[in-house]
Design a protein with these regions (language model features):
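Compact structured core domains
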Residues: 18-69
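Nucleic acid-binding interface residues in structured DNA/RNA-binding domains
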Residues: 3-10, 64-166
């Protein structure tokens, strides 16, 4: 069973989804790919996982870097899972590029190169926004490109994180 809850953030409404294992989704309401992995049958109900995710968001939007992570259980291909694991290693307050992620993943796989577009596709389909920090990935020239929640939210998240790490 999938359980959901709504969370009101300073940047707008967020839908949280979880199963008994961990958080399965975190989407800004109305974002691209909104709740695309959410089962048709789900129940709005408080669970320990959702409570932990809400606590994480309270700390984060309160201007502090959370020192814990709720259990995560995102559905995705093996490739997406690899990319999302890389995203989790980008430190708060820092950014990286799609190309740098592609080079890092290629090196970890023992390959000479990897497509930045393929990595970008996996980043763009991240189902747990903010906690899996896809907003920390920028274009080669540092431009704020592509964020399913919208560029305005990406910029606001990066500004918030810069304040956290000062």
């Amino acid at each position: 069973m999938i359980y959901t809850q709504h969370y009101e953030s300073p940047l707008g409404g967020i839908l949280l989804a979880a199963d008994d294992t961990g958080l399965t989704g975190l989407w800004f309401e109305g974002q691209k790919y909104f709740a695309r992995t959410l089962d048709a049958v789900h129940q709005e109900q408080e669970t320990a996982v959702l409570s932990e995710a809400r606590r994480w968001l309270d700390v984060y939007f309160g201007g502090k870097e959370p020192d814990f992570t709720p259990p995560l259980h995102p559905a995705g291909s093996a490739f997406q899972q690899e990319v999302w694991a890389l995203l989790r290693r980008i430190p708060c307050g820092q950014t990286t590029t799609y190309g740098a992620l592609a080079r890092q993943l290629a090196a970890e796989r023992g390959l000479s190169r990897m497509s930045a577009q393929a990595v970008g596709g996996a980043v763009g389909h991240n189902v747990i926004s903010i906690i899996i920090p896809c907003h920390r990935v920028v274009g080669t020239n540092g431009s704020l490109t592509g964020y399913a929640g919208g560029i305005d939210k990406k910029a606001a998240l990066l500004r918030l994180e810069m304040k956290m790490t000062r």
